[in-house]
Structure formats: structure tokens, C-alpha cells
Amino acid sequence: MIGIGSSLLFDRRSGKGGSPIPQPDVYYDLSLKDNSSPTRNIIDDLSGNGHDAEIFNAAYTESSGYRSDGAFVFDSIDDYAIMQNVTKGFKTLFMEVIPSLTTDKSGFLYDQRVGRTSFGISISLNHIAYNTYNWGGVTYINGKLNTTMNGKEVYLKHQIITIVNGTDLKPQKVVLGGDIGLSGYFSNMALYKLIGFYDELTPLQIEKVINDYKLKYD
């Protein structure tokens, strides 16, 4: 397993420190590259499962590329990334992210929708944050179940989004920074980490992932 310490693996398998969690099926840490990296257009999957993501149209500047605080910024114009070798949808997904660097800018942060099933993560101003396209699922913000906070309250905030959805149908593609049809719903997010599981995690497991992977929020 790439990028995950052996002691941490032991703790998870043994259940030490609380509810055990499965190994991630995809894991990105955007702080590991910069705009001069030879493979800057590839987000490496640190889980070892081959779900690298290819970045398209980035200018590789602080406003469209990697920036010094460890994030990758999508410019909301045409930047996006596509996850590779996806055979089914993730049932639990974590994003450490600033969802939009400008106010009143909607768009998709992540999309694995199959028709009106599974989920996409988007900012919709007058709807429950990140839940508009999460059919049959639940949404957590900073580890807490969200049923009241709406989209206009999440701009500019460094936060942890967690989606739990029981549908694992294979999507046509998995897109970061835009919608699955690449039809213009690009986001202006700053993405720090992304972690996905084929399992539905419990609230205790969600808390453990946040702690183990040192996901941060304001």
C-alpha cells in the first residue's frame, strides 16, 4: 500500500483506537505535487488501486493548478479531472475542500451520477448543501450530519464533505471539478484530499477517517 504507514494499517485491522475502517479504495493528497512536477497532470491514487485522475485544461498557476497551501484549484472555466479505471460507484466519499473561492458560484465538485441514482456533489444556493443530487443518501459537513445548512452558507469555507450513498452502479465516468456531461457546470474549488470507499461507513467510522487521515476544516 502506497503512502499509508504500517502502524496506521495495524490500528485499522485490529480495531485499535475505536471502530475499525476498511482500507480506502481511492485516496488523493493534492499537497504531494506542485506546478513544476513532471507528472503534474496526474493525481496519484495513494491507495494502490489504480484510480489515478487525469487533469485537463489547467494552466498550472495558483488560480488554475497547485497552490502553496497544498490544494489544487479548479478555475470554474474549463478545469476538470477524470478518475481512471472505475468499475463501480463509491458508497462513501470524503472531500477536504474549499467548495468555491468566489461567492454565488455554483458548480459540481464531484460527479458519479448514473441517471437519477448514486450522487454528484454540487453547490445549489437554495437547497440543503451538497444534497441536491444525492438521491437516497446522506450528507455530512465536518463530520456532522447536515439537514439544515444550505448552499449559500458554505462558500469560501475550508471544510470536509462526506457523502454516504448505497448505490454502487458503474458510472460512465467520474469527474472532479465538473459535471459528468462536462456541459459547463465547472467549479471554482480548492481540493486538498479525496478519499473514497466502496463500503457504506457508519458515523463512528466517518469520524475515524477524519482523524486518521488528518482531514482539516475551519
Residue ranges and their predicted role:
Residues 132-157:
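Short, aromatic/His-centered strand-loop micro-motif at the edge of beta-sheets
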